[in-house]
Amino acid sequence: MVKGIWVSTSHIPDLGVAAFVGDGEGLRELHIGSSVTSAVDLIGPENLDVADKVSETARVVSGYSVRDIIGAWRSGEDLSDLALRPIGTPFQQMVWSGLRTIPRGQTLSYQAFASTIGRPSAVRAVASACANNRLGLLIPCHRVVRSDGSLGGFRWGLERKRQLLAWERAS
């Protein structure tokens, strides 16, 4: 077992259960499900297979307890100093970095977003990077929608995507 990788779960009112995966350098994954089992089932095997046991132990990342991260996100607090360690290709990393620049409460189409990162012909690759984002909320792929304004897809379901966008617009 690789030391230092941990999984922690926390109930989030009105949203479900969040499963966080981290290590000594930051968060690797964040998933939301309707139960502990459904949230943990979304964790990538490369992390879950080597993690210490799943627990509700409060973990701290960049000074935030995992229970406080969602509260900070909901209140609109700037979380740019939160150490994130997403695992992906260089292109995915570029997309995920760009997603963090979309202002809270706003959306962009996949086409418009691809243009903002200087890759206007990479719309499908952008959509694929969004689909492979394992740090939803903190890397806000929910802010990217189809050109016609419809929601498109979302790892945690379209109802959650709709709910997240509504919360952001209201705050």
Positions of PLM-derived features:
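…primarily DNA-binding HTH/wHTH and HhH modules…
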Residues: 147-171
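Residue-level signal for inorganic ion chemistry
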Residues: 99, 113, 141-142, 164
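Basic nucleic-acid-binding alpha-helical/helix-turn surface characteristic of O6-alkylguanine DNA
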Residues: 1-120, 171
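Extracellular LysM carbohydrate-binding repeats and other cell-envelope/extracellular binding modules
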Residues: 135-138
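LysM (lysin motif) carbohydrate-binding repeats in extracellular/periplasmic proteins that recognize
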Residues: 120-123, 164
